[in-house]
Amino acid sequence: MDSGITPHMPMTRDLLFDLGGVIVDIRRENCVEAFRRLGFADIADYLGDYGQRGVFLALEQGAVSPEQWRAQVRRHLPAGVTDGQIDDVFNAFITGIPLERLQALRRLRAEGYRTFVISNTNPVMWHGPILRAFAAEGRDINAYFDGVVTSFEAGCCKPDERIFRLCIERFGLDPAATTFFDDSEANCRAAAAMGFRTIHVPPSSSFLDFI
């Protein structure tokens, strides 16, 4: 999508980032294969490239707790599978964050941009591999962002306008002065409809290619 953005982003004050596929590297196939090895044969029906289904979506929306999610996942698995095994195969979705992206986020803040996250994610990944990935430089996520909104605490997922509205209200965003980065075209369209400047980050790219 055409954002009108230049390398120095003169008309942009705030930057709103998706995580997976934009900052955090993800590999759906790692997760699918790991679940299949554990015995969840039809896992691909629940995990999409840009959204989840069934109890996985419910976890992402905060409608079920991690404990309730694991209990429902166990219905698809052989007896004896532990909580740790379930979490480990699910977390295989996340492969890490290249250090240059973390460094770029700190540089953007040092240059005066406010940086924010709006992410469709779940508490299992968030409190596990995602926050660990942000600790790679010995800092925590607050070193990189001025604020975070996750779908599981918002109770809704992109492209629902409610999660964008929550970001606007919580952080005092002016959509016309905010550039939104996402790997989902549907999410970019939803943000553009609310007045945000948008950049679609295609597969095998990152936000670094657009700043």
Which residues make up each language-model segment?
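Conserved phosphate-coupling serine/threonine residues in phosphotransfer and NTP-handling enzymes
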Residues: 119
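N-terminal cationic-hydrophobic initiation segments that often serve targeting/anchoring roles
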Residues: 106-109, 172
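Structured helix-beta-strand junction loops
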Residues: 111-112, 144
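N-terminal helical cap/lid subdomain that shapes the substrate entry/recognition surface
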Residues: 8-103, 110-111, 122
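Proline-centered loop/turn at the N-terminus of a beta-strand
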Residues: 114-116, 197
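Asp-based, Mg2+/Mn2+-dependent phosphohydrolase catalytic module
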Residues: 2-17, 122-123, 127-211
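Anion (oxyanion) recognition and catalysis
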Residues: 109-110, 192
